UniProtKB/Swiss-Prot annotation:
This is Crossover junction endodeoxyribonuclease RuvC. The gene is ruvC. The RuvA-RuvB-RuvC complex processes Holliday junction (HJ) DNA during genetic recombination and DNA repair. Endonuclease that resolves HJ intermediates. Cleaves cruciform DNA by making single-stranded nicks across the HJ at symmetrical positions within the homologous arms, yielding a 5'-phosphate and a 3'-hydroxyl group; requires a central core of homology in the junction. The consensus cleavage sequence is 5'-(A/T)TT(C/G)-3'. Cleavage occurs on the 3'-side of the TT dinucleotide at the point of strand exchange. Binds 2 Mg(2+) ion per subunit. The active site is at 8, 69, 141. It comes from Xanthomonas oryzae pv. oryzae (strain KACC10331 / KXO85). Its EC number is 3.1.21.10. GO terms for cellular component: cytoplasm; Holliday junction resolvase complex. Coiled coil: none annotated. GO terms for molecular function: crossover junction DNA endonuclease activity; DNA binding; magnesium ion binding. Keywords: Cytoplasm, DNA damage, DNA recombination, DNA repair, DNA-binding, Endonuclease, Hydrolase, Magnesium, Metal-binding, Nuclease. CDD domains: RuvC. Gene3D superfamilies: Ribonuclease H-like superfamily/Ribonuclease H (3.30.420.10).
Length: 174
């Protein structure tokens, strides 16, 4: 059994999703939740909350591997910078506990789950619900975190079949 923590980083809310993968490659939902960072004081205090909150979650759920969504350039450079800083704090929380970090772009996650890199959030939420047999509507940040964990599980399974590491299994020749 392998436990994967998926992280959808954000400067206000960070999505957390945890799945277990059995020996047959089947995914099972373990936990999902947002880590709410608003109301934690200035931005540096939010980063501190993210670092400590993820650390506590890692200690509680003991994942074997971590998958995190890469930063994309959004509407403003300032927003992208804050998102990058939140992502950096999340990665620090993971590597401080000697866990491997695997990174996936949003388009790669959408492609892995829905079959097209331009899929919208509702399609991703729907597929996550189906794949993990979840009832009810998922919050976008939780769905994205679970989606990145599922993506890593798929890449991991492909890598094992091919006898390569996960980075080699996902990389494309340009």
């Amino acid at each position: 059994m392998t436990r994967i923590l998926g992280i959808d980083p954000g400067s206000q809310r960070t999505g957390i999703g945890i799945i277990d993968i059995d020996e047959g490659g089947r995914s099972r939902h373990v936990h999902h939740a947002p880590l709410i960072l608003l109301g934690e004081g200035d931005f540096s205090q939010r980063l501190k909350r993210l670092l400590h909150g993820l650390g506590e979650l890692i200690e509680t759920y003991r994942p074997d591997e971590v998958a995190i969504e890469k930063v994309f350039m959004g509407k403003s450079a300032a927003s992208a910078l804050k998102l990058g800083q939140a992502r950096g704090a999340a990665i620090c929380a993971v590597v401080m506990r000697d866990l491997p970090v695997h990174e996936y772009a949003a388009t790669e996650v959408k492609l892995a789950l829905v079959g097209k890199g331009g899929a919208d959030k509702l399609q991703v939420q729907h597929m996550v619900g189906i794949m993990l047999n979840l009832k009810g509507k998922l919050q976008p940040d939780a769905a994205d975190a679970l989606a990145v964990a599922i993506t890593h599980a798929h890449v991991r399974a492909t890598a094992q079949c091919l006898g390569v590491n996960t980075q080699q299994a996902w990389s494309r020749k340009k």
